[in-house]
């Protein structure tokens, strides 16, 4: 997933993150000292995309969303997100687990979703408001 946050100078900053979803709720994590975390502390608005690279432009599909990223503070929800991430990315389980203070977990609940499907027409998207 690529997530764009707003830098202090007003320019968007897009970065790739691992993510997991539970229904429409999306979780991702980052370092609390990262530029992403600093940007989110100042402005919680984000845009994100979930897609995959294809060689045929008419095969482009994906999701583009506008929403806000909220820090997850409740320890049980943090544990839930970490368990979901471990299920989605089992290779993570062989790595040393970070201490709670070494990670920041965020929750995203989409407000506006563009569903991209270029097989219908070049540039086609359906807009859904949640």
Language-model segments: residues:
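Acidic-enriched, low-complexity/disordered segments with a strong bias for Aspartate over Glutamate
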Residues: 9, 22, 43, 51-56, ...
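Alpha-helix boundary recognition
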Residues: 41-42, 86
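Structural motif
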Residues: 25, 45, 112-114
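Short beta-strand segments
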Residues: 1-32, 40, 47-52, 61-62
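Charged, gly/pro-rich active-site loop segments
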Residues: 57-130
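Short N-terminal helix-initiation segments at or just after the protein's N-terminus
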Residues: 7-15, 45-56, 90-95, 102-105
């Amino acid at each position: 997933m690529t997530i764009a946050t707003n830098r202090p100078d007003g320019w968007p900053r897009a970065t790739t993150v691992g993510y997991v979803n539970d229904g429409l709720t999306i979780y991702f994590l980052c370092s609390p000292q990262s530029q992403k975390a600093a940007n989110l502390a100042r402005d919680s608005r984000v845009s994100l995309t979930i897609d995959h690279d294809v060689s045929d432009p008419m095969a482009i599909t994906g999701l583009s969303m506008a929403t806000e990223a909220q820090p997850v503070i409740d320890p049980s929800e943090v544990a839930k997100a970490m368990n979901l991430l471990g299920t989605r990315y089992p290779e993570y389980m062989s790595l040393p687990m970070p201490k709670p203070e070494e990670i920041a977990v965020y929750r995203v609940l989409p407000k506006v979703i563009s569903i991209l499907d270029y097989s219908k027409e070049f540039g086609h998207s359906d807009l859904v408001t949640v």
